[in-house]
Swiss-Prot record:
Its EC number is 4.2.1.19. The lineage of its organism: Bacteria, Bacillati, Actinomycetota, Actinomycetes, Mycobacteriales. This is Imidazoleglycerol-phosphate dehydratase. Belongs to the imidazoleglycerol-phosphate dehydratase family. The gene is hisB. It catalyses: D-erythro-1-(imidazol-4-yl)glycerol 3-phosphate = 3-(imidazol-4-yl)-2-oxopropyl phosphate + H2O. It is found in: Cytoplasm. CDD domains: IGPD.
């Protein structure tokens, strides 16, 4: 089993955004985040810190229109960088879950580093469709962010909001729970020397 840090990088430039991401799965939670969207920066910082990922995200987007393009395109690039960092999947734990509270909110994230991209979100209260945090982050985009992340990193991801009222608390618990579940799923398992699949491939 290799002991070299697993580092992934990806970039994306379009007429709507210019994004660079680097992630070290074997980091300590050192982050360098700048998307021009303060609440999104806060969420990505939480993602890096609670995943113990060294994470750099630099994004310039058409935020004068809205946050959607920058958030979704960042998810594309973060997913691609995550896929790059995971590599051949030899020796990883593969499956993991995390239940994470934030005050009145409780969120669960379940991850399979499967090579089969799939996403499910369930349980968010109806007001998450219309809530806006900090005047710029519409919480309806949570679903788009995590779905895009799952598709581009080729993982299976389920996010369940068991309960909660405050859109900030629900959103932050989602980001932290996904980070914690990913952290555990990509950990190296000392008892697993090959690819964790009966098929021999993921």
């Amino acid at each position: 089993m290799t002991t070299a840090p697993r580092i992934g990088r990806a970039t994306r430039t379009t007429s709507e955004s210019d994004i660079t991401v680097e992630i070290n799965l074997d980091g300590t939670g050192t982050v360098d985040i700048d998307t021009g969207l303060p609440f999104f920066d806060h969420m990505l910082t939480a993602f890096g810190v609670h995943g113990s990922f060294d994470l750099t995200v630099h994004a310039k987007g058409d935020i004068e229109i809205d946050a959607h393009h920058t958030v979704e395109d960042t998810a594309i690039v973060l997913g691609q960088a995550l896929l790059d960092a995971i590599g051949d999947k030899k020796g990883i734990r593969r499956f993991a879950s995390c239940q994470l509270p934030m005050d009145e909110a409780l969120v669960e994230a379940v991850v399979d580093i499967s090579g089969r991209p799939y996403f499910v979100i369930n349980g968010e209260p109806d007001h998450m469709i219309s809530a806006v945090i900090g005047g710029h982050y519409a919480t309806v985009i949570n679903e788009h962010f995590f779905e895009t992340l799952a598709l581009n990193s080729r993982i299976t991801l389920h996010v369940i909001c068991h309960y909660g009222r405050d859109p900030h608390h629900i959103t932050e618990a989602e980001y932290k729970a996904v980070a914690r579940a990913l952290r555990a799923a990509v950990e190296m398992d000392p008892r697993q020397t090959g690819i964790p699949s009966t098929k021999g491939a993921l």
